[in-house]
Amino acid sequence: MNAYFDTSALVKLFAPQEAGGDLARAMWDSTDLAFTSRIAYVEARAALAAGSRSRRVAGTEQRAGRRALEGFFQAMDLIEVTPDIVRAAGDLAEAHGLRGYDAVHLASSLTLDLDDTVLVTWDRELAWAGYAAGLDLAGISLE
């Protein structure tokens, strides 16, 4: 199995206290290839910083999270944000009411020409759009 991790799933890999962290780790451990968009790095760093500012994440946890993020990023196959992905993301944002980075994640995941790729996300709107596009899902339940 191959997996595309959006940022909501990626954060759960290095923040085990987050709900869903066990499932995210199980998906990571069982995948042959793990993919994400290069923009996930910015989103994940922003999430860590926001957690620190709101005092939900201690400074030591933020630093540990940043180190873990670096490790996961080195182990993943990164999808670059190309002009074609940007155009496709714009179309997907309009069609599905997605936020900008979520549309980039969906467009990136759709570039993978692999039959057994699962979109791993805890973002409900992205999950619905991925489902509509025919992707298999893991993470958030659509029920």
Go through each PLM region and give its residues.
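Short active-site oxyanion
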Residues: M1, T31-A34, A75-D77, D113-V118
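Short, well-structured N-terminal submotif of metal-dependent ribonuclease cores
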Residues: M1-A40, G51-A64
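Acidic catalytic patch
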Residues: A40, R67, Q74-H96, A103-A107
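Helix-adjacent hinge/juxtasegments
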Residues: A49-V81
